[in-house]
């Protein structure tokens, strides 16, 4: 990208864990009723990925709670925009794009998609985005870091899915 004349700088996601938790609350605010009713009407079974994210056992939120969640969403969007403005002041240019992974792994094994955080935060922000393939996994280059210690239970599940070769890696822009 730099060879093409673009300025590239590191971007640290702002309050990422907070955003992931917030979007999950929004996704599951009806306790999974909408998605499971739609699946029932279609005759399609719920895939494990959906049941993890939209579990019918999740508590439904009432209208006032939902409004409060959306106020938190709006506040987070405003804070994120402020982070953009601060970075633009720092670099002296407008930010044209954030280029980030869409998934933590190169490909997803059937029924093993566990972490929605990368794409979901972009959705929470209401950003326009596109996913593009950028390279391929290569077992000679993309080696497992044996001494890696997972940051959480979810991170351990994701790390267990990271051994691929020949599959595409994608970025969300």
Where are the language model's segments positioned?
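Amidase signature
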Residues: 1-120, 124, 134-169
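Short, hydrophobic/proline-enriched secondary-structure or compact coil segments at domain edges
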Residues: 171-173
């Amino acid at each position: 990208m730099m060879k093409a004349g673009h300025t590239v700088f590191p971007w640290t996601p702002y309050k990422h864990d907070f955003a992931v938790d917030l979007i999950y609350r929004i996704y599951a605010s009806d306790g999974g009723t909408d998605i499971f009713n739609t699946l029932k009407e279609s005759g399609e079974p719920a895939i494990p990925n959906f049941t993890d994210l939209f579990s019918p056992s999740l508590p439904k939120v009432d209208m006032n709670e939902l409004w409060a969640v959306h106020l938190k969403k709006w506040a987070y969007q405003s804070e994120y925009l402020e982070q953009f403005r601060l970075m633009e002041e720092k670099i002296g240019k407008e930010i044209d794009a954030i280029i980030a992974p869409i998934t933590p792994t190169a490909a997803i094994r059937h029924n093993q998609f566990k972490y929605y955080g990368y794409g979901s935060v972009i959705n929470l922000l209401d950003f326009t985005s596109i996913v593009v393939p950028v390279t391929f996994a290569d077992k000679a280059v993309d080696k497992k870091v044996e001494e890696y210690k997972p940051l959480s239970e979810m991170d351990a599940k994701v790390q267990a899915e990271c051994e691929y070769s020949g599959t595409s890696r994608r970025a969300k822009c």
